[in-house]
Curated annotation (Swiss-Prot):
The keyword Cell membrane applies. It is a multi-pass membrane protein. Belongs to the SURF1 family. It is found in: Cell membrane. The chain crosses the membrane at residues 7-23, 201-219. Keywords: Cell membrane, Membrane, Transmembrane, Transmembrane helix. Its main location: membrane. InterPro entries: Surf1/Shy1 (IPR002994), Surf1/Surf4 (IPR045214). It comes from Rickettsia prowazekii (strain Madrid E). This is SURF1-like protein. GO terms for cellular component: plasma membrane.
Length: 244
């Protein structure tokens, strides 16, 4: 009875996980479709987005704040020099919002001259709104002293820059206003290429459930096979011999 209960409980858990992954598959598809529609649409003024800010393509007008750059470490596989940083600068809008903007990527060897990208002219930026990143336990902490960031944690950035930042940041589309050749522009297309692996996960859970039932049926079948008479007699003889 115990093994029957254990098998039944495990089967229910595995199939429940499978159906949960199917539900997540549907949610992720709607999410990715929403991102795709936002990316291909023209940017709208940030002030007109009243709710569900994340992943909207927006326009903001204002200026970059000088001497407040963040260097966010990141590898670009398609670049000639793969090791480098994303240039992240606070942008003060005409509505007095302060928003971190990811402006472009530069190679590690250009770190000492990227400060030339400072530009305090009033201009417009078009980009996609992104959520704050969470610091992961398996990653080293941000090296604020040397300005080497691994995670764009906006609460930590607010404290480090001594600014009241919005709880989202923007990935800018196209070439930066500085027009520096060393600062490579960013593409938003990769946002729509996020993998939706939930179908594979669902198949895995359902497969494990089926495998469990097959093993259980084989076990039950083998335990119900009658022992041949000659083997029973031999077993009795062995027991009698042991007694004697």
């Amino acid at each position: 009875m115990k093994i029957n209960f254990l098998i039944l409980t495990t089967f229910i858990i595995l199939t429940s996980l499978g159906f949960w992954q199917l539900s997540r598959l549907k949610e992720k598809k709607l999410f990715l479709d929403s991102i795709q529609s936002h990316i291909i649409s023209p940017g709208i003024n940030l002030e007109k987005v009243q709710e569900n800010l994340l992943y909207h393509k927006v326009k903001i007008t204002g200026q970059f704040l000088p001497n407040k750059d963040i260097y966010l470490y990141g590898i670009r596989l398609m670049a000639m020099e793969k090791d480098g940083y994303y240039l992240v600068t606070p942008f003060k809008t005409i509505a007095d919002q302060v928003i971190l903007v990811v402006r472009g990527w530069f190679s590690n060897r250009n770190k000492n001259i990227i400060m030339k990208a400072t530009n305090n002219q009033i201009h417009e930026i078009i980009g996609v709104i992104m959520p704050s990143e969470k610091t992961l336990s398996y990653l080293p902490a941000n090296d604020i002293k040397n300005n080497v960031w691994l995670t764009l944690d906006l609460k930590e950035a607010s404290k480090a820059l001594k600014l009241n930042l919005e709880n989202f940041y923007i990935i800018a589309e196209g070439k930066d206003i500085s027009n520096l050749d060393i600062l490579l522009p960013l593409s938003l297309n990769h946002l729509a290429l996020i993998k939706n692996d939930h179908l594979e996960y669902a198949i895995t859970w359902f497969g494990l459930a089926i495998f469990l039932i097959v093993i259980y049926v084989i076990y039950r079948h083998s335990s119900n096979i009658p022992v041949p008479v000659n083997k029973q007699l031999k077993s009795l003889e062995q027991k009698n011999n042991q007694k004697n």
